[in-house]
């Protein structure tokens, strides 16, 4: 026991001294999107506790409406006494005074058609930061796929960095046009021809030692019937100069590892496999971890037979050279919209007496995949198991898929009669009648097509392409106690395909030249699942939970519903004669933003009447330790940092940023 305690103390010291959390002039920083390179979203700040949680007040609000902010996806970074964030469809870069919430400076890239086309324009999630000879530098990737380096104090583009991009209005220095390094024909103003494909960005780059590593985004696969696209290759640049360093091909070319997983010569003309989720890094070992999207398109891959590396994978690359250290593919020949949605989380574990430098990936599938982050060896066995074949003409799925044997799943995987709403005989009968037109099955239940031999409407997929863990609620981790916390929900999809030429008519501004044999059968993400006639979800609650794992053992510590049962659900259950003791707290059904501190796990959701709330949970049991009404709903992340001696909690509230602190931190109080 003494050895374990000593290890925790030593680890606490190392966390305090790590580059992502190092103190600077009375400021406990929030260095990256996830606070540290490990993306733990953990703060060492401890002024706030369950005892004073109820005393939190709004210290200030920053309103991004003038910058066109809408979604609130960006988690600000607090570095050297300033907050840095992005906002709006033009992805303004903004520096904010953390004491007052006043804008210090802002920068906006000149408008271009290639940026205005972006379907991820208002999806900016934050900035990256580095130092050049002691000078702070803010780095941003724009919707138009330009990399810009700004002086952290002034917001002015760096001199003698990057190269002229050949577009009117852009600075002569401080910018890199990254399209030139992808290797496709393009126009600096218009971008890559849309019939070829499209590349944009939502997550920030990451600085690993002296290398800037850049991911990217593509057009959503559920909004397309086309088969042509460009690959989302990973790019890297020199931090000091902006010079190009390397490119990693996410769709392997002839002679490269994994090329044989692309049959039908699909590697030549299809694409995606982007890395739209944030990246993580291990600077000490010069490794960067890339979570990838699926290949073009969602729900049908008959034109791209094979396992399709490196789709739906995690890739560990040497940050200096771009060489692959290892990879693991979570889903072979991915068609379920099971892309990898959140940053990998790095933790140093002690498993059965063995110290393991680990990386943990939460997924939509309801599994935590855990690896030795240096070698890629699974910490616990992952087995290939048989899965159903497709009945859709032209589709050939992998006969097996990886199955995590430990830790236990955190979400409902698949749906059967036992999962349906059945609290009364009438509710059960209605559930069964509703599901008669749908094919139920396991996690890898494949889509079906219209006019299928079974006469069914769609195939159920649970927890669904929007279920499990997703980008709206990044996981958090306590690296001192090695506990991993995640927010999950069930959001089953009903997968229905129609002929590609018909599907193409459903999508506005279609740009492809060749359509797939089959494609998504409805506009939007996919066919929504059927609802119970009562208005409830067709499956039993809880609908959303926070799950905690002890990652040294893989055991679940607790599972608790998020928020409170919505009043509309209570009313339905009351009419059906179902007491609350039977259905319990259903959870709101929402994914929730979280941050973890030395004394509590903080999250935001809603009370039964829709009131926005903040809850502080006991980190060991999940029990509510404190709660308070929040000023607004928040999502996509939460952060906590110290400025001028006081701890703040930052909420991302749509177009605004809301800073909470104790009364002593209020700007007008004069407290220091």
Q: Where are each of the predicted segments found?
A:
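Long, low-complexity segments enriched in small/aliphatic residues
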Residues: 280, 401, 405-491, 501-502, ...
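Bacterial N-terminal signal peptides that target proteins for export
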Residues: 1-10
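Repeat-blade elements of multi-bladed beta-propeller folds
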Residues: 30-34, 69-92, 118-146, 195-224, ...
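Bacterial N-terminal signal peptides
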Residues: 9-20
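Short, solvent-exposed loop/turn elements at domain surfaces
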Residues: 37-43, 66-71, 94, 298-299, ...
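Extracytoplasmic/lumenal domain signature
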Residues: 51-65, 93-117, 133, 147-195, ...
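Mature N-terminal segment immediately following signal peptide/propeptide cleavage
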Residues: 25-65, 547
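Short aromatic-glycine motifs in intrinsically disordered, low-complexity regions
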Residues: 40-48, 145, 306, 463-464, ...
């Amino acid at each position: 026991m003494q050895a374990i305690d000593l290890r925790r103390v030593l680890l606490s010291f190392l966390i305090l001294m790590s580059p992502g959390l190092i103190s600077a002039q009375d400021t406990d920083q929030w260095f990256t999107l996830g606070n540290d390179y490990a993306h733990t979203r953990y703060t060492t700040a401890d002024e706030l506790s369950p005892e004073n949680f109820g005393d939190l007040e709004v210290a200030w609000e920053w309103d991004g409406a003038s910058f066109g902010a809408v979604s609130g996806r960006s988690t600000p970074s607090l570095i050297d006494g300033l907050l840095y964030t992005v906002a709006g469809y033009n992805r303004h870069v903004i520096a904010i005074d953390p004491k007052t919430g006043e804008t210090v400076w802002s920068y906006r890239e000149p408008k271009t058609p290639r940026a205005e086309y972006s379907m991820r324009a208002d999806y900016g999630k934050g900035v990256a930061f580095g130092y050049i000879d002691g000078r702070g530098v803010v780095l941003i990737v724009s919707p138009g796929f330009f990399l810009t380096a700004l002086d952290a104090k002034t917001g002015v583009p760096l001199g003698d960095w990057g190269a002229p991009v050949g577009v009117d209005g852009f600075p002569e220095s401080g910018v890199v046009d990254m399209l030139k390094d992808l290797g496709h024909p393009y126009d600096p103003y218009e971008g890559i021809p849309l019939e070829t494909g499209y590349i944009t960005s939502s997550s920030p780059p990451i600085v690993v030692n002296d290398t800037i590593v850049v991911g990217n985004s593509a057009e959503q696969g559920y909004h397309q019937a086309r088969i042509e696209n460009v690959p989302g290759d990973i790019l890297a640049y020199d931090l000091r100069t902006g010079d190009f360093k390397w490119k990693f091909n996410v769709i392997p070319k002839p002679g490269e590892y994994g090329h044989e997983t692309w049959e039908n010569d699909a590697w030549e003309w299809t694409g995606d496999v982007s890395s739209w989720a944030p990246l993580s890094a291990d600077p000490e070992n010069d490794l960067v971890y890339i979570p990838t999207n699926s290949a073009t398109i969602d729900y049908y891959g008959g034109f791209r037979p094979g396992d399709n590396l490196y789709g739906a994978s995690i890739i560990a690359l040497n940050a200096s050279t771009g060489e692959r250290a290892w990879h693991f593919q979570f889903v072979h020949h991915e068609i379920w919209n099971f892309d990898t949605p959140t940053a990998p989380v790095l933790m140093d574990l002690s498993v059965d007496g063995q110290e393991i430098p680990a990386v943990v990936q939460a997924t939509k599938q309801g599994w935590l995949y855990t690896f030795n982050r240096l070698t890629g060896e699974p910490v616990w066995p992952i087995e290939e198991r048989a899965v159903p074949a497709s009945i859709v003409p032209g589709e050939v799925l992998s006969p097996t898929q990886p199955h995590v044997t430990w830790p236990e799943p955190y979400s409902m995987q698949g749906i059967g009669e036992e999962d349906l709403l059945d609290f009364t005989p009438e509710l059960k009968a209605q559930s069964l009648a509703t599901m008669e037109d749908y094919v139920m099955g396991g996690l890898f239940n494949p889509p079906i097509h219209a006019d299928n031999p079974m006469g069914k409407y769609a195939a159920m997929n649970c927890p669904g392409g929007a279920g499990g863990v997703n980008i709206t609620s990044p996981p958090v981790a306590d690296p001192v106690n090695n506990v991993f916390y995640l927010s999950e929900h069930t959001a089953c999809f009903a997968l229905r395909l129609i002929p590609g030429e018909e599907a193409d008519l459903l999508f506005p501004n279609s740009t492809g030249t060749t359509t797939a044999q089959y494609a998504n059968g409805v506009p939007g993400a996919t066919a929504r699942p059927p609802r119970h006639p009562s208005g409830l979800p067709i499956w039993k609650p809880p609908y959303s939970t926070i799950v905690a794992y002890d990652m040294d053992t893989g055991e679940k510590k607790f599972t608790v519903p998020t928020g409170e049962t919505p009043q509309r659900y209570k009313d339905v259950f009351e009419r059906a004669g179902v007491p609350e003791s039977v259905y319990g707290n259903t959870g709101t059904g929402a994914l929730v933003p979280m941050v973890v501190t030395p004394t509590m796990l903080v999250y935001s959701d809603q009370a039964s009447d829709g009131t926005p709330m903040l809850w502080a949970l006991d980190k060991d049991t999940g029990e509510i330790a404190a709660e308070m009404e929040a000023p607004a709903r928040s999502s996509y992340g939460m952060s906590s940092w110290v400025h001028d001696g006081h701890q703040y909690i930052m909420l991302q509230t749509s177009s605004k940023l809301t800073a909470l602190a104790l009364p002593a931190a209020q700007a007008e109080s004069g407290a220091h």
